[in-house]
Amino acid sequence: NIDKKVNFSEWYNTIIYASELADIRYNIKGFLVHRPWSAIAFRHIYRLFENELELDGHQPVIFPTLIPEENFLKEKEHVAGFSPEVFWVTEKGNEKLERKLALRPTSETAFYQMYSLWVDSFKDLPMKLYQSCSVFRAEKETNPFLRGCEFLWIETHDLFETADGAIAQTTTDLEIMKKVATNHLSIAFLPFERPQWDKFAGAEKTFAYDCIMPDGKAFQFGSTHYLGQHFTKAFDVGFMDSQGARKNPYSTCFGPGIWRVLGAIISIHGDQKGLVLPFVIAPIQVVIIPIVKGDAKEAVLNKADEIKSILATSGLRVHIDNTDKTPGFKYNWWEMRGVPFRIEMGGREVAENSATLARRDTREKAKVPISDLEKTITALANAMQNSLLEKSQNELNASIKTALTMDDAKRILDELCFAKIFICTLEMDGKRCADALKDFTKGGKVRGRRLDEKPVSGKCIVCGKDGMQAYLARQY
């Protein structure tokens, strides 16, 4: 019963452990043990993204976890950006390795080394590959599903004959993120083009997907990068075009942060009772609670088994809780774990050939004939998805306020909101004003320009020069 709006950090950390999503007591700081409840949810989140990627022509691959140091050194911006975060392997058994090997922080320098061997002709393009994996970064401050030394994601690495083809892919990546995060997982978010000083190391442009957390901070749970020819030139990836000229392809990468997506789901949809999991990723979608009294025990348990069989046959993930805990304890337990629907089955329901169906997000209950259970749950699952999205969108919209001055910007961030501001430019010349804003607002970072809004002109709230609309927020 902690109010996440009042004390988000306490609420979040309490629910992570109480609902058995994860355990931080593994004896390496910053590394997390994922318990079955999160591991199963991750499996479903992965499938949603992988299905969309494969519909878009991507194919899966599995690359080694280790990347040799010489690969990093081939792209100067990339190595400068990631070196402070890299874990290095320097020994094998009792022997010192002749060269250092990195635990992958991201895999551009692995993929492009192989692309130089695989790509020869324009007929090989586009090449669109992805892998689902863990990556490793030496983070100083960690928090489960928000920031970690090891985390789960998907990374795509795509090659195109032309710049236009690569840039078009970044738009497709955004559409994939919308389909999964918004349509399936009910997460409202803002798509941004990041400022030039905040782009991915080695990219020409970075596009990122931010939601707002209950404490008013921006949370990036995915990004797409237009890499131009930076990596293809560095790794000598080339192809013969239709005229026989040798060229370097243009490339992109897309990183749906699977780990962070779950962090967003926990934070945005959860309430004072605990998790509220979207139907499509819930490890258990329907839990049946037999309410056993006296002579009705056998009939109640038989009816619970019958209902489970009916629903499981239709593809639903169903569990019967026949432990010796009280019904009240079971209700609270499964509500805390975010199971979308609860069926209460007692002697009265057996006599009426019905079930009492409770919905997790609204906590509404209704008596439903057993013959109608499957279609009722399907309809309510769609309603739940829409309701969660509407709530998420309303909260996001209410958290965006316009700042005409630096004082406005600080006040808005202190109100746990995003500030809509004007800044002179998002090119490198604007970094001085962005740094001034960060200092003045105690941590507010320029997120960039929204991709789904038309450009708006105005005077920079720092220097007064003609500028453009952007967003400011504190962040994770």
Model-assigned labels for residue ranges:
Residues N1-Y476:
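NTP/phosphate- and nucleic-acid-binding module
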